[in-house]
Design a protein with these regions (language model features):
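Short, solvent-exposed interaction modules
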Residues: 61-98
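Short N-terminal segments immediately surrounding and downstream of signal-peptide cleavage
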Residues: 20-35
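Short beta-strand motif characteristic of blades in beta-propeller domains
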Residues: 33-41, 82-88
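Trp- and S/T/G-rich repeat-edge/linker motifs of beta-rich repeat architectures
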Residues: 53-68, 102-113
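Tandem-repeat architecture and repeat-register "anchor" residues
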Residues: 49-52, 96
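Positively charged n-region of N-terminal signal peptides that target proteins for export
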Residues: 1-4
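Primarily extracytoplasmic ectodomains and periplasmic/lumenal surface modules that are beta-strand-rich
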Residues: 45-46, 92
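N-terminal signal peptide c-region/cleavage motif recognized by signal peptidases
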Residues: 13-15
Length: 113
């Protein structure tokens, strides 16, 4: 195997992990405490996780598209399939919603300041 191909095969997964771990994360539980929305503070992407029964690990669904680097938070709510996110630096908000949990959630454009 050529060194350049070998380096590509080794570095590509490392770059993917670095991109996926952009920033810190937090989350809020939904009503009933059986699901949780999580947010990437660095790029504003959100994802829903849920579980069925204490013997099963949580199942997490695809992440929404991320945005510009910033300081993002999630706003807790009662709806299981949608959540609000806020850019804590600018105050802009956006609503994200799953149409199907097998697809990434669709998010509205950010509000104008």
């Amino acid at each position: 195997m050529r060194p350049s191909v070998f380096a590509f095969l080794i570095l590509t997964p490392i770059a993917a992990v670095a991109a996926a771990s952009d920033g810190q994360f937090s989350g809020v539980s939904t009503k009933g405490n059986l699901s949780v929305w999580r947010v990437n503070h660095g790029n504003g992407s959100v994802s829903l996780c849920s579980f069925e029964g204490h013997k099963n690990e949580p199942q997490c669904y695809p992440w929404s598209a991320g945005g510009q680097a910033g300081n993002y938070q999630i706003i807790g709510g009662d709806d299981v399939l949608s959540t609000w996110r806020i850019n804590a630096s600018s105050g802009a908000v956006s609503l994200c919603e799953y149409k199907e949990v097998t697809d990434p959630p669709i998010c509205t454009p950010w509000s104008t300041e």
